[in-house]
Amino acid sequence: MVFVISVILAIIVILTIGLILRKRIYDKVDHQEKWKMDIMARDVAQQISKIKSLNLSGETQEKFELWKGRWEHIITKELPDIEDHLFDAEDAADKFRMKRANNILTEGDQKLQNIEVKIEEILEELDELLSSEKTSREEVAQIVPTIKLLRKTLSQSRYQYGKAEKFFDKKLDEFDTQLATYEDNVESGDYLEANRLIQVLKEEIAEFEIKMEQFPEILRRCKQDLPSQLEQVLAGLQEMKNDGYRVKHFGFDKEIITYQDQLKNLQQQIEQGDITDVSTKLDEIEERITEMYESLEGEAIAKNYLEQRIPEYEKSISEIAATYDDTKLEVEELQKAYFVENNDMERFFTIGKTISTLREQLKELHKEMDDDQKSHSDLQNIVEDGFDKIEQLEEQHEEFKKSIENLRKDEMEAREKLIEMRRQLYELNRKIKKSNIPGVPGFIWTRFETASAKNSQVVDVLEDYPLDIAKVQHALSEAKQAVDQTHEQIDIMLDQAYLTEQVIQYANRYRSQQPDLNGKLKEAERLFRNYEYELSLEHAAKAIEEIEPGALKRIEENQLTLNR
């Protein structure tokens, strides 16, 4: 019984699902049916008929026939095929062949979309034709007065166009011919060709307007301005030659002739109404003319510079040479008393060699001023470079003079430092004597002897002849280091001795109470009397710290307070 019920329920479910799926297919069929009816109801035929009233020919007639044929094919062939597909889909759905029905509907949907695309193309092309016909009429209304205005401008300014006037006249006639061709195409109904023609004509007129506007200036520059400028450069060249300026090396004469020939060729090109690249070439020539003027101006400035500065240049070389010679004599005298470092002497001799080179260059400069082989600009560069070198030589010479002057200064400073170090050793000796300590350890006397010996070495070096300041500085440095170390060791020794006395005195309060302490303090006192202050301090400090921890620190602090 349960099985039967299950089977019945399964059948009901299957039927229900089938009915639902079939209902969906029916809905899709209805949708495509409405879509098809909507397409059939559109006024495409009416849109096509709008141009039927026009007098058509040529490509426009071909387009009309093509659009008409496309629409008729859609109405008579493609849409009826859609109807058949819809019947097939319903039939498949009635038989519950859902997959086939869906495939048929999918194919039908694609065909309807393709039809929509075709209709859209037809309507767009129709609209393009109608709008182009209107647009071309509007543009012709603008073109005609433009051509008249261009003719008027040409007529009133013929002299500005020279022989090229014929070219411009001919071009305007061609525009009139193209307008007539446009009218013929319109009258015969070939609107598409007429529109294409008017668009081309519009672009040509725009280019022609620009050419007419630019042409007078280009012609004037090519025929008048630049030839005149080149003649002026030639005249300037000749005048500068007569005045003694060196301009031959520029080679401008040949270059100007080349440009004059180039301008003649450009004039022939312009007379044909062709200004292609002419402006660019004229700009290049004009730029080169500017460069020529700058070069000639530079040569004139250079000549004036040389006339004014060469006497000053000669004087500067003579002065630096005389200064060098004076310093050389001074150095020779100085070397009798002092040793001058080889590096310093090499730098000094290099200055002399450079001065000799400048003298030779000056002789060569005078020759070149007379032989007319080098331009004044090149000679100016030589003189300017020479002035720079003289300035450098003056700086180097001044540095060298300071270095040799420092020899005497360094000697005096060394002697003063030696006196100061001797005074320090004397004061240290007095300090030891006033300290009332039992005696001085041997290593302290060794330090004293070393410091004294180092001072003696400074004296010996100072007495050398010629005096070597580098050796003096080295000996002085070693002596100072020895004195500083002696000073440091004496201060440490005295501090240790004073602190040891303070510790022993402080520990005496416990001496009678602590037998062990008494023995340790006696050892510390023995070491103290034998000048072994560091060991004595260690013994005394250790002994008092065992009795009273922290006592050493308090004693040290008290001693620091007293020293202040």
From Swiss-Prot:
It is a single-pass membrane protein. One of its GO terms (cellular component) is plasma membrane. The keyword Iron-sulfur does not apply. It is found in: Cell membrane. Residues 1-2 are extracellular. HAMAP family: EzrA. Negative regulator of FtsZ ring formation; modulates the frequency and position of FtsZ ring formation. Inhibits FtsZ ring formation at polar sites. Interacts either with FtsZ or with one of its binding partners to promote depolymerization. This is Septation ring formation regulator EzrA. It comes from Oceanobacillus iheyensis (strain DSM 14371 / CIP 107618 / JCM 11309 / KCTC 3954 / HTE831). The lineage of its organism: Bacteria, Bacillati, Bacillota, Bacilli, Bacillales.
